[in-house]
Amino acid sequence: MAKSKGSEQVLVVAGKDVRVTHETVPIGALRLDPDNPRIRLQLERSGNKKPSQDDLQKFIKDQSGYDGLQKTIRLAGGIHDPVIVRHDGSVVEGNTRVTVVSTLHKGQPSSPRWKTIPVMRLPKDVPEQAIAMLMASYHVAGKNKWAAFAKADQVYRLVHKYKCTPEQIADETRNMSKREVEQTLDAYEYLIKEVMPAAGKRTDETFLESKWSHALEFVKNRELGTMRTDPSVRKAFAKLLTNNQIKGAEVRRLPKILKNKRATKVLKASGFQAAEAVLKKADPTLESLELRQLKKLTARIGKMKASAVDAFKTDVK
């Protein structure tokens, strides 16, 4: 089936105007991208260095949300927003949608609904760095956002593979500050370089996604400060994550435990809840907001000058 050319459009890619063409092409003319951030990690860990299109489809179908998207596209009778492709037909944005249409086409090869797909084709001279930044604008900042870990993976690739600066990424995504980009990089590196080795074969993208908020809070929390640079603390926290011994909301309470030697020792041996129990035993006010407020008030009164206390007594009378 011959492709049909439509209109041209100017698309802003990494701050530059790029003239793209809108076309309708046979579904078989497109190739999935093995560098797709949603499947990149699983593909690397599989050891498959030359995946076939069927291999890539399998990885994509295993992603959460795939079945729901396939149902939506099937009921709609196709897709309306064009997928973005390179000049040679390799998919830049829309790998999951291409997989859905390809799968439906295999099931109903005679149906005209699944024979073609709308595309927006980039010219040959667009550099890969600009394409990677375009994906960040779509999926890190745009309405069709990837899961948090996939977004972090894309940010990490922009810095380490394409040599983009945190400032450039912040400008392109618009919803992240330079500091937030740096924190994202720190959290990603911690998960990849310290948590994954501790977890071994148990890690996959679902695991890493479930621990993302923990890692981000760990690198953001100001109270952790210099404690965060202690190798033993980093190792202990990685162990807590791999053994599911700390919840996301509990990371914020970690500094209090690390300031107590006994609680820290229990933390490393038995997990967060056991360590927090040590603190509660030493200080019962931890479990009661009223008692904590009374404790603070008592401390403030103890620091007041005698004349101020006498004035208070006189006023009460």
Q: Could you tell me what each predicted segment is?
A:
Residues 53, 57, 113-196:
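Amphipathic, charge-rich alpha-helical segments that serve as recognition/docking helices
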